[in-house]
Amino acid sequence: MAVHYLEFEKPIADLEAKIEELNLLSATSGSFDAEVDGLRKKAEQLRRKTYASLDPWMKTQVARHPQRPHFVDYVEGLFTDFVELKGDRQFGDDQAILGGLARFRGAPVVLMGHEKGHDTQTRVVHNFGMARPEGYRKAVRLMDLAERYGLPVLTFVDTAGAYPGLGAEERGQAEAIARSTERCLTLGVPSIATITGEGGSGGAIAIAAAGRVLMLEHSIYSVISPEGAAGILWRDGARARDAAMAMKITAPDLVELKIVDRIIPEPLGGAHADREAAISAVGDVLAEELAALSGLTPDQLRKARADRFYAIGRPG
């Protein structure tokens, strides 16, 4: 797979291109090992320096990287015996939210998440991860199933927001989001939400109102996209960077506000740079958090979840 470089990664991309050029030349013009090693060290240093000082707008670009692991990648890398459940039993099946039953390190769980797709064809199938009412009603159905059988709920959040189309609104988009959020909050089983890329607006909250909320290091979580905020505040979507800088959408800001409980470190260069390592890190943290919640009663889980939401934004 060809590497997709972000705008701010252009200096790194230039160095990588020089390395590739020297590797090709070495096949016909002798060895350039010393030069290649020097350039690789320089690229590594530049990557470390760049990713150590990402601003919120840069993190937004990383969170949206097309090669970042998606829900289907986490399912393949972390779970076994996955059985997908489809449909909301009212209108149809929404492929923007996928979910079903699986085993996580041998234990049964219910999982669900937004799926954006990795290429043009799959992005259309999954509607770029923007769910319609059927997706949120499917999520409620899965959560009902989890509570009935006492299974933990694991959700993976990666969406720009709920789909704002006419049909979705006619079929009760706002009500479906509200019902899904309510069901998250009233679950009597352990629930953990992991924000893996974008966490956009109510479309994200609908499956992220969990007992524990985790967030990958370079993901974002906000009530509106930076472009949308810029359009509303300044009537100028080009000021998205200004909006991102002001909105407190990054993981450290959200931990400070008590919206997020824990940050999952990403490999150098972002989760897309080493997908296997990123997925493994998520699995290890999920196992720790699930173990901490597994001994609580349904009433204790509901109270702890309520307490964490009441504490959001409060000092102390």
Predicted regions, residues:
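Conserved catalytic cores of soluble enzyme domains
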Residues: 157-287, 295
